[in-house]
């Protein structure tokens, strides 16, 4: 079946926009093709510095013919209504069909040729493409990320003819801006297109560009007994800057190695898009860097390396100046400047935030580790944790906040635990980032994140959908991970509102789902009013294991049956009060369940009190047999009112007893 190939060639597309642009192009094309009944066998998109490409395999040459039935006026309706319907359909009265007293028209619609639909589709995509930022060029009214230069659109080897703001579609593409002959080349299909680009020094696929960069970079480093410091984010960006990647290894002045390694790496990455290089023996940074050129230089990259080394030297000289100047001022002496730094218009200055975090750290410390020394150090670290925000290095490299504070604290000779807490109080900053494990560092990190959550929820700035401008989901997940991994028994209700506690429940459910655990059980346990995350997760894990057993699954079914009966009765009026009785003449199964519930009631409390959740589940399991037998042999809705009321009391007792372990009504499975 025919193939569609589309290339949108433009000036340089920002690297950060390319991956999303490829996804958007695929989504828009799929939606529009599907709306026209055109379903490709395969569809793939590519993005690079100068081009967006789409290839769709297995498209039909035209739409299938369609038949539509239109409902018209009722038989006997005014003549004007019928005439209007005939004009609309283009039919005569004899061609209408009467059914159930209504006129119907059957319209035969021949399928449109695919190229005609594609032409409309491409123009619509060009005019509605969701670039984060776009521009107009010259007299064109078309908004595109950068000036659009050429549109290649070929279907089944032939040009799909159309024009958008003076740019006519064609069957020509271009190679590398500098390494090709500069002449357009003819394209008939994707295979020829990809081969033509490769022959003209363009690697179409971003993943292939990344593979080439990594492979060549590691080879260069290995030849010099060095090791590349891999950086996935930087690799993604660099692969979006070059069409023909050529790694080049350069040298820098070894004197700069006395700077903190984070400063060197950040200066390389942020300002120059260089990779750092280290000594594989000791793991320390080596006086070298790796840049990725967009051309294969005749001198092997020597001139490129020399020029880049000169630029890097200037950058690192600036960083050294800031580093030297920053160490002349104590962190404590920087606090006054935080009064001039706004944290948020509704939440005051950064100095006020520091005061909140400092106070919160003092309250949290006993729960993390109940020692006076821990509290003293945590309060000191919390007070100084944000002081580096007004330092020169952090002003230049905001991503180093906290890290630089740790270096400055170390230079002042502060306690190592205080240094560590300042350095790591932002952690974890992502799902793969380690949590601070020392008691002082964990306390300060918790205080920082809890203040963020309480403050922003307090002014109504809550995450909605995909929008989370203040990273509150990350903050909540950070609190959860710190608490769980340090086994901190933290009563969250003492520090957060019910709304924030519900938010923690949601994030904990997400975390457990990502770990392949029963996330629905989080709501079932949170419903008990517990706010100790360590205890909640322990209960969830044991409950999850219990529900996988035959006893657990059957008992859950019995619980839901009991609850459904009770809910139906509650709609009629209040349930009978009091305890279920051992009624004379009652069925043996009823008496057995009364005894089983009473025994469970007596043993369940102590097990839960000592947090023996496995023991609690063992006790629950003993209820399964009596519950099954009761429902098999006993009629709850007895004609005898006293019997019926006693059995309803018994079911309520079963519900309440199980409800001490979890709210089983919220369990989905």
From Swiss-Prot:
Keywords: Aminoacyl-tRNA synthetase, ATP-binding, Cytoplasm, Ligase, Nucleotide-binding, Protein biosynthesis. It comes from the Bacteria. Tetramer of two alpha and two beta subunits. This is Glycine--tRNA ligase beta subunit. Coiled coil: none annotated. Its main location: cytoplasm. The keyword Ligase applies. GO terms for molecular function: arginine-tRNA ligase activity; ATP binding; glycine-tRNA ligase activity. It is found in: Cytoplasm. It is an enzyme of class 6 (ligase). It catalyses: tRNA(Gly) + glycine + ATP = glycyl-tRNA(Gly) + AMP + diphosphate. The gene is glyS. GO terms for cellular component: cytosol. The keyword Heme does not apply. Belongs to the class-II aminoacyl-tRNA synthetase family. GO terms for biological process: arginyl-tRNA aminoacylation; glycyl-tRNA aminoacylation. It comes from Phenylobacterium zucineum (strain HLK1).
């Amino acid at each position: 079946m025919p193939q569609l190939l589309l290339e949108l060639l433009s000036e340089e597309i920002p690297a950060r926009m390319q991956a999303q642009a490829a996804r958007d192009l695929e989504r828009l094309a799929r939606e529009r093709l599907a709306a026209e009944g055109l379903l490709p066998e395969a569809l793939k998109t590519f993005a690079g510095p100068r081009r967006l490409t789409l290839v769709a395999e297995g498209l039909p040459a035209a739409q299938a013919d369609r038949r539509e039935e239109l409902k018209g006026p009722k038989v006997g309706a005014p003549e004007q209504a019928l005439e209007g319907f005939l004009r609309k359909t283009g039919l005569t009265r004899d061609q209408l069909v009467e059914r159930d007293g209504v006129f119907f028209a059957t319209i035969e619609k021949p399928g449109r040729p695919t190229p005609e639909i594609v032409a409309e589709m491409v123009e619509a995509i060009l005019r509605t493409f969701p670039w984060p930022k776009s521009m107009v060029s010259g007299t064109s009214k078309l908004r595109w990320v950068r000036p659009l230069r050429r549109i290649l659109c070929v279907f089944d080897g032939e040009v799909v003819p159309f024009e958008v703001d003076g740019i006519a579609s064609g069957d020509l593409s271009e190679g590398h801006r500098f390494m090709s002959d500069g002449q357009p080349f003819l394209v008939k299909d994707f295979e020829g297109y990809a081969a033509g680009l490769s022959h003209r020094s363009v690697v179409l696929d971003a993943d292939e560009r990344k593979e080439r960069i990594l492979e060549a970079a590691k080879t260069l480093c290995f030849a010099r007994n060095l090791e590349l410091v891999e950086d996935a984010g930087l690799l993604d960006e660099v692969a979006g800057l070059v069409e023909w990647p050529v790694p080049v290894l350069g040298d820098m002045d070894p004197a700069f190695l006395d700077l903190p390694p984070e400063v060197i790496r950040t200066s390389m990455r942020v300002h120059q898009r260089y990779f750092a290089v280290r000594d594989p023996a000791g793991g320390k940074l080596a006086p070298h860097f790796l840049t990725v050129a967009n051309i294969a230089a005749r001198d092997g990259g020597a001139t490129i390396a020399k020029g880049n080394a000169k630029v890097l030297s200037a950058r690192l000289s600036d960083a050294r100046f800031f580093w030297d100047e920053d160490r002349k001022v104590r962190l404590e002496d920087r606090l006054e400047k935080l009064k001039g730094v706004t944290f948020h218009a509704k939440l005051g200055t950064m100095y006020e935030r520091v005061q909140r975090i400092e106070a919160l750290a003092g309250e949290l410390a006993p729960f993390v580790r109940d020692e006076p020394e821990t509290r003293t150090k945590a309060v000191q670290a919390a007070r100084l944790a944000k002081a580096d925000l007004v330092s020169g290095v952090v002003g230049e490299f905001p991503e180093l906040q906290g890290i630089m504070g740790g270096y400055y604290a170390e230079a002042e000779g502060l306690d190592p635990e205080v240094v560590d807490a300042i350095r790591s109080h932002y952690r974890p900053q992502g799902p793969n980032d380690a949590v601070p494990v020392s008691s002082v560092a964990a306390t300060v990190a918790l205080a920082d994140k809890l203040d963020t959550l309480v403050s922003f929820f307090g002014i109504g700035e809550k995450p909605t959908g995909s929008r989370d401008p203040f990273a509150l989901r990350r903050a909540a997940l950070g609190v959860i991970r710190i608490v769980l991994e340090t086994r901190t028994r933290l009563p969250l209700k003492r520090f957060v509102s019910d709304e924030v506690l519900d938010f923690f429940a949601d994030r904990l459910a997400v975390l457990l789902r990502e770990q392949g655990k029963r996330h629905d059980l989080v709501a079932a346990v949170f419903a008990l009013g517990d706010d100790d995350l360590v205890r909640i997760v322990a209960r969830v894990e044991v409950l999850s294991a219990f529900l996988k057993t035959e006893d657990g699954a059957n008992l859950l079914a019995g619980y839901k049956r009991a609850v459904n009966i009770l809910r139906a009765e509650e709609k009629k009026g209040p349930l009978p009060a009091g305890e279920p009785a051992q009624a004379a003449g009652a069925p043996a199964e009823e008496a057995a369940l009364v005894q089983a519930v009473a025994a469970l009631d007596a043993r369940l409390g102590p097990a839960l009190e000592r947090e023996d959740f496995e023991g609690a589940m063992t006790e629950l399991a003993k209820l399964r047999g009596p519950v099954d037998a009761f429902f098999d042999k006993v009629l709850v809705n007895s004609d005898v009112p006293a019997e019926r009321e006693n059995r309803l009391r018994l079911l309520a007792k079963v519900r309440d007893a199980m409800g001490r372990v979890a709210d089983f009504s919220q369990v989905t499975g």
